[in-house]
Amino acid sequence: IIDLKLTNKEIFKQFSKGHRYEVNRKTNLEYIILDWTNYKKKQILEMMSLHEVVSNKKTRSTETWMINEKMIMNKKGFLIFVFDQKKIISASFFFMNNFSSIYFSSCTIRDYFVKTGITHKTIWYAIQYLKKNNCNYFHLGRSKTYFTSVENIKERNIEKFKHSFGGIKSLCLKTSSIPEAFEN
């Protein structure tokens, strides 16, 4: 959880060295924030199409994407699109209310991962947008520090990515059995 009441400098200082480098790295990419003020009907379907291309399948119904559109129109969400020479290469959706925001969904054409930290900068732009809109907290989602060998590599990388933004950490212990000390 990133405390948006902190200054930009204080928030940025909590990022890992690699994340700070990627945010500061110069690119020719264009980042566009779409909220209720500039969103055009059915633009969420551009994210849906990109998501299907990236995942090679349809993972959600069109109806769920249209729910995200309603959230945007009701000032409860926003999108960040990233373009390379007018071609959409990344899209992220964020839920928000008057108090907090949740990093909800994201997709990026994988070929661009090696070129630049696209999503690093997307998160930074989201933080700036949320602060400007008086949001207090930004939830990036779960990030584990311990992994078993059977876990999905992609999920592990996503969680490490989120963890490297710093912020408020809460400790949670997951076990497959109840320790003897707690039985009885």
Language-model features and meaning:
Residues 1-112, 129:
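A conserved beta-strand-loop-helix scaffold within acyl/acetyltransferase catalytic domains
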Residues 76-181:
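Aromatic (often tryptophan-rich) hydrophobic motifs at membrane interfaces
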